[in-house]
Swiss-Prot record:
It comes from Pyrococcus abyssi (strain GE5 / Orsay). GO terms for molecular function: rRNA binding; structural constituent of ribosome. One of its GO terms (cellular component) is cytosolic large ribosomal subunit. It comes from the Archaea. Transmembrane segments: none annotated. Keywords: Ribonucleoprotein, Ribosomal protein, RNA-binding, rRNA-binding. This is Large ribosomal subunit protein uL22. Part of the 50S ribosomal subunit. PANTHER family: 60S RIBOSOMAL PROTEIN L17. This protein binds specifically to 23S rRNA. It makes multiple contacts with different domains of the 23S rRNA in the assembled 50S subunit and ribosome. The globular domain of the protein is located near the polypeptide exit tunnel on the outside of the subunit, while an extended beta-hairpin is found that lines the wall of the exit tunnel in the center of the 70S ribosome.
Length: 155
């Protein structure tokens, strides 16, 4: 059995909302925070198109917090940014899962808005490389938890 977890989103209404989560994803927590910030509030179809553009290296993700030594990207008034392809692929899977959960509930997939998306640090996968004179060099891998809540917008 898997570990029990709770969503950080409060006031979940099962009639109008659907949710999904990705646990222990082997992606950068810092870049996941930046991508989630960019997707929050978007319509789900627009968010999926945006992630496709990031994966194809057509649109960069602006870096607001973790942007030390990052170059500016092309575009009018665009500051520091990157193309986090691995993060975009992982978050796209979670968004598609949320879309399928909404379809299963009978919600219209074209009217879904991302009202909550968050990235949290997961457990660290500890590893090490053997080095000279019997010393180990640690090589740890960060994991990330992603959670998404979508809501059907009434127009």
């Amino acid at each position: 059995m898997g570990r029990r977890f709770d969503y950080s989103f409060q006031n979940f209404d099962p009639e109008r909302m659907a949710r999904a989560s990705g646990r222990d994803l082997r992606i950068s927590p810092k870049l996941a925070v930046e991508v989630c910030r960019e997707l929050r509030g978007m319509m789900l179809n627009d968010a999926l198109r945006y992630l496709d553009d990031v994966i194809a290296l057509r649109r960069p993700v602006p870096l607001k917090r973790y942007n030390d030594s990052q170059g500016h990207k092309p575009g009018k008034g665009f500051g520091p940014g990157r193309y986090p392809v691995k993060v975009a692929k992982a978050i796209k899977k979670v968004l598609l899962n949320a879309q399928n959960n909404a379809k299963q509930k009978g919600l219209d997939p074209d009217k879904l808005r991302i009202i909550h998306i968050a990235a949290h640090r997961g457990p660290v996968l500890r590893g090490w490389y053997p080095r000279a004179f019997g010393r180990p060099t640690p090589f740890n891998e960060q994991t990330t938890h992603i959670e998404v809540v979508v809501e059907e917008v009434r127009r």
